[in-house]
From Swiss-Prot:
One of its GO terms (cellular component) is cytoplasm. The gene is hutU. The keyword Cytoplasm applies. InterPro entries: Urocanase, Urocanase-like, Urocanase_C, Urocanase_central_sf, Urocanase_CS, Urocanase_N, Urocanase_Rossmann-like, Urocanase_sf. Its EC number is 4.2.1.49. This is Probable urocanate hydratase. Its cofactor is NAD(+). One of its GO terms (molecular function) is urocanate hydratase activity. It comes from the Archaea. Binds 1 NAD(+) per subunit.
Amino acid sequence: MEEKAGEIHAPRGNKLNTKGWGQEAALRLLMNNLDPMVAKDPANLIVYGGKGKAARNWEAFDKIVEELKKLENDETLLIQSGKPVGVFKTTKDSPRVLIVNAQIVPHWATDDVFWDLEARGLTMFGQMTAGSWIYIGTQGVLQGTYETLSALARKEFKKDDLSGKWVLTSGLGEMGGAQPLAITMNNATGIIVEVDEEKIRRRLRDKYLDTWTDSLDEALRLKDEALKSGKPTSIGLLGNAATVYDELMKKNIVPDVVSDQTAAHDLNLGYIPEGYTVQSAAEFREKDKDGYVKKVYASIVKEAEAILWFMQHGSKAFDYGNNFRTRALEGGLKNAFDIPGYVPAYIRDLFAIGSGPFRWVALSGDPQDIYKIDDAIIKNFQDDPHLIRWIKLAKERVHFQGLPARICYASYGEREKIGLMINEMVRNGEVSAPVAIGRDHHDTGSVASPYRETEKMKDGSDAIADWPILNALLNAISGATWVSVHHGGGTGIGNAIHAGFVIVADGTKDAEERIKRVLNADPGIGVIRHADAGYESSIEIIKKGPKFRYPYL
């Protein structure tokens, strides 16, 4: 695909470029996904996660922008895998945009078929928040990583944080780049292996990473120094994960916690094989794709073997949902799934109570709007000290990329309260412009992904994909501003179906009513999904009489 010259930045301020704030939010967040401070490769429309794109091609992007500017307040724009294909008269409470990305009939949902169709310009990989226009940079995954490590500390070490511990992990891309800050926010020290020096420098620039080196011995010295001084430190190590993990194993050096957040789900672009630089890997891939993939598999297996050895010697390890174990299994490592998945190990209890990665974006572009919302949450949610601790840490330490945004894990009930609070702040002028409210697709009731979010469900319903479709339909009829249904995010083609939404808080009474409906329905179906699978905490919420009914209670 031909690259596009010039940078894209979302408009700021109160001036509309469209016919309503719903359309304006879609326009600004589409553009924000391609801001060079946000996107992985904006010239090629790639936002994050291997080849997760915001639009199919530049012609489609330009058409989407054109249609959003013309779209009436009672019309809906249809996006088919990153391409605008129709505008229909609907209602003012209908979504302004409906997005469906990367759907393939199951029998054909393989990497080979999908990427052939993609190369022919017939589909697009949207990851989770790339093609649904609600990616907010590395902060988007930061709290999930923070929450995972916090839950690990409580479960494995019986502590509130990881003070005195050190973490070995890899990957400093658009998702993995959250790891160093999440590690130090949990008061641990970390060595994060990354093969691409540019990604290391980007995390240093964004203040997610403290320091870096290209020497394993120096990284270990810095780690020991940090542990001795009691000062949590994140150390980027330029190198290949397979090589580094294997060397540590041979040195008999065992981390307290070990993981991986490379884009291993994408065998072509997401994992550089051992012995290659980013540039030499690209040249090899171009000349011999099959040979390249074999090398990738061999490196993933080598890294996974080291992780299993670390586990045998006391490390707490987890797969962070990037399909790393599956790739190791495909590469011939039969016991790859002895590495536990992070959701059943640490996050499932949060999903069961309707909690997940909730986020909001200041369409004004003014960071003060986010800080004012932070302060309001600290004031009004005193009964949730964990939430308040996160908001205070994020306010102090998170560097905004593109439009200012905030993410937090908020549960059923809390999301509606936060949404209504934000709408009221817009109404009374405390916040200078409308705010877009949404979430990751990685959430309580919006995803079927047997290798990640729905791994080891209590009733065996890991692969049941009705729930994300019900979630999307429910959010659409409840009044979300836009709704998306995607395939393959996080764990790759054939492995996940998931849905998302965005709703705009513009301060109006209409927005208030839509917020009430959507922010009750969206986490509510997550509670039902887990209650239906037999989770007691979900059943207890339903017994307390929420704003929905579950026929079996």
